[in-house]
Amino acid sequence: MRSYKIFGIKDGGAEEWVTTVSNAADGKQAHNDMKQQGYFDYIRCRDVLGGLRFEYNLATGRKTA
């Protein structure tokens, strides 16, 4: 089973690891949790090899990468 690492970015800083997920439902839950907490500006998902899968601006909901 593939795993994906979820990172948060605050104030344009470095990626901060938040959690690791293995399916879309867990990824959506992490996204919703991070959005509600309001601490991070961006959510970034990377695959097991470190490749960027997506990035969203949590304030606007726009996909940025």
Whereabouts are the PLM-identified features?
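Short, flexible N-terminal segments of the mature chain
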Residues: 17-36
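Hydrophobic beta-strand residues in large extracellular and virion-surface proteins
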Residues: 4-6, 21, 43-45
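Surface-exposed loop/edge segments in extracytoplasmic proteins
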Residues: 13-19, 51-55
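Serine/threonine-rich, low-complexity intrinsically disordered segments
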Residues: 11, 21-22, 62
